[in-house]
């Protein structure tokens, strides 16, 4: 597997996002991956993690993608996590379609729950 090669490109890197004062963060990269507008995040680890262990990465990226969509009028519906470990192993995780919607809805529910506990 390889990272950003071929027609993939990073359009903007280190993109600050904020949504209605609810949350803010910095996305590593907004670009094109497999011909789709994507939020791309780079992760390093001691060892490549299985997908089941990185749900928080997908939640964070869905939050950033949705904030970017609101701020800049984009329509990002794909998350790409590019992970490399100490042994130079590489793994990519791509989330789109129903899976992207699942993480977006889960993030929104966490946000609602957080703000309800503050009231």
What kind of region is each of these model predictions?
Residues 1-11:
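Single conserved hydrophobic/aromatic residue that forms the stacking wall/gate
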Residues 15-117:
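Mg2+/Mn2+-dependent nuclease catalytic core
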């Amino acid at each position: 597997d390889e990272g950003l090669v071929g027609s993939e490109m990073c359009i903007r890197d280190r993109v600050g996002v904020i949504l209605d004062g609810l949350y803010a963060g910095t996305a590593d990269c907004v670009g094109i991956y497999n011909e789709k507008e994507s939020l791309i995040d780079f992760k390093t680890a001691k060892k490549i993690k299985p997908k089941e262990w990185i749900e928080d990465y997908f939640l964070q990226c869905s939050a950033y993608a949705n904030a970017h969509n609101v701020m800049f009028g984009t329509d990002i519906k794909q998350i790409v996590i590019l992970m490399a470990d100490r042994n130079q192993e590489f793994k990519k995780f791509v989330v789109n379609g129903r899976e992207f919607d699942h993480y977006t809805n889960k993030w929104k529910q966490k946000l609602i729950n957080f703000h309800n506990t503050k009231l």
